[in-house]
Amino acid sequence: MARADDPDERKTQGGHGDRRRREFRGGEQVVRAGTLLLAATDLTEPTFRRSVVYIMEHNDSGSLGVVINRPSETSLADVLPRWSALAADPGTLYFGGPVKRDAALCLGTLKVGASTAGVPGLRRIDGRVVLVDLAADPERIAPLVEGIRVFAGYAGWTFGQLEGELDNEDWIVLSALPTDPISAARPDLWADVLRRQPLPMSLLATHPIEVERN
């Protein structure tokens, strides 16, 4: 599962060097930056149960992502007031994963047609989704984004670890929409993502939240 050791501290807000991008295929599954990992129905570990993970990085050093459906009760205005005006509803800090929960990562969704050229503090992950440097000037970024989401901590896998979990069918790999990282806190984003898939995958959305109650 997502690792808690962090030898290189995964400085996601800064530079990454020239790491070779790679993909893993397991059947029809493809993991790359910009895809979603949905917890399989039998993955019951509390940290990742019914979680939706947005993959930010996937290469020879391992994989890194943030859980995008775990809102906290902490208002972003209380911890990062400079960025609160850009925060998508509900405007709270999200729990991004079990690794380095004292560190913050920020994702944003660019407006259609917006360009990041010449704008410091934005790094494109995939399509309209960008990594936002929280040390940047929010006033320069505000005109370019539909919204941002700030995550405390992240989920990380060492090289080969995620592949093993995919072989074990712990995760479902799906395409992401540009707005997924900033989507409003709905009752069950996990089920919402599954409902938009073709049959028979969409049937998994009917899996009950509490199996033992049925």
Curated annotation (Swiss-Prot):
Q: According to its UniProt record, what is one Pfam family this protein matches? A: DUF179
Origin superkingdom: Bacteria
Q: What is this protein called?
A: UPF0301 protein NFA_55110
Q: For this UniProt entry, what's an example GO CC term?
A: cytosol
Q: Give TM regions.
A: none
Which NCBIfam families does this one have?
Answer: PRK00228.2-1
Family, similarity comment: Belongs to the UPF0301 (AlgH) family.
User: Where does the secretion signal sit in this chain?
Assistant: none
Spans annotated as Disordered? 1-24
